[in-house]
Amino acid sequence: MRITCWNVNSLKARLGHVLDYCRSGQTDCLLLQELKLADEAFPHDEFAAIGWNSACHGQKTYNGVAILSPHDINDVTKGLPCLTEDDKADDQSRYIEATVAGFRVGSIYLPNGNPCPGPKFDYKLAWMRRLHSRAQALFAEEIPAVLGGDYNVMPQEIDCYDPSAWAGDALWHMDSRAAFFLSLIH
């Protein structure tokens, strides 16, 4: 199964390119981030016209994630499970998960977290704790799973041109990096 992740930074602006990529046959499942459109504006019909299925968790102007595939998309879940009462107030469309061709796939648009420190950084770390919890639950199910997308983290020096230029940025912050590795490795 070939799975591709793409932060489209506005599906409306990139729809032609996304449709062309789907038609190219280079992937079996396409995970999109930063759709910048509400669920009701998602172009399901355009994808269906080329034989692709789609599921989205959209949000007007900001965020938004989707799963596209020529295979059936089943058991769709929108949003991460809540761990605390505060999590219930999370109205940002940053996570969608479904079963595609025997794989459990999640499309992730992790919060940026800037400015750091501050409420946006706190939200990022809380969101990453929820992601870690969900990843652990998926691993416990012992089914093939892929959580792909835009993690908004630079885990290693090789992931940026000049680490010193990112000092103080949430993408390079040690807490972000530690949470990233915790989510994926443990």
Segments from the language model and where they lie:
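N-terminal, active-site-proximal structural segment of metallo-dependent hydrolase catalytic domains
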Residues: 1-53, 60-65, 174
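Active-site-proximal beta-strand elements of phosphoester/diester hydrolases
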Residues: 1-10, 102-117, 148
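Active-site beta-strand/loop signature of hydrolases that rely on acidic residues for catalysis
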Residues: 6-7, 22-40, 105, 134-157
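Structured beta-strand-rich core segments of catalytic domains in phosphoester-bond hydrolases
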Residues: 36, 42-115
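Short aromatic-enriched loop/helix-cap "lid" or pocket-rim segments at secondary-structure transitions
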Residues: 42-44, 157-162
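Surface-exposed cleft-lining segments at the edges of enzyme active sites
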Residues: 81-86, 110-128, 166-169
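A short acidic, glycine-rich active-site loop
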Residues: 167-178
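Conserved small/polar residues in nucleotide/adenosyl-binding loops
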Residues: 186
